[in-house]
Amino acid sequence: MQTLVTERLAESGLKRYEVSAYAAAGQQCRHNLNYWTFGDYLGIGAGAHGKISFANRILRTVKARNPDAYLTAKGAAAKQSEVGIHDLGFEFMLNALRLVEGVPIGRWAQTTGMAIGEHPLLLERLGSAQSKGLMVRRPDRFQATARGLELLNDLQAIFLP
């Protein structure tokens, strides 16, 4: 079914750029592309989530869900947590592997502040995903294979901490 949908949409000028998104050339959703490339975002408003990267850490924020509690806190985060090193590989790949074209390998260092080989498990898990035919590591990018996109949950699970 997915193949048929992709073919029909392509005939209409809509190309698949993400596991569940299609767009005309140059019309991809920049908002979602920011998430898929592990970009930062501010959580503004009751119940909002945010992600902020610093040179040596990544911080997740959650605002109070109840509007009264949010207003009482004057918009301050109700919860902040640092993304641990073992979670980084999963969080990065959870999003990046959704993109049909994959993500530039340099984006890993740019967003995490570490080389691929510095992560305790990433190279091992990349190898596992490749050996199962679910992804490829090209000279310039990580990319899910067609099978990897079909079995995206299985591919993402390989990177669980």
How should these model regions be labeled?
Residues 147-161:
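Short, amphipathic alpha-helical interaction segments positioned at domain boundaries
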Residues 1-114:
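C-terminal scaffold of the Radical SAM
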Residues 130-140:
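A short, conserved structural fragment
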Residues 115-130:
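Short amphipathic alpha-helical interaction segments
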Residues 141-146:
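Minor-groove-contacting beta-hairpin "wing" of winged helix-turn-helix DNA-binding domains
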Residues 87-94, 123, 149, 153:
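Non-catalytic, well-ordered alpha-helical scaffold segments
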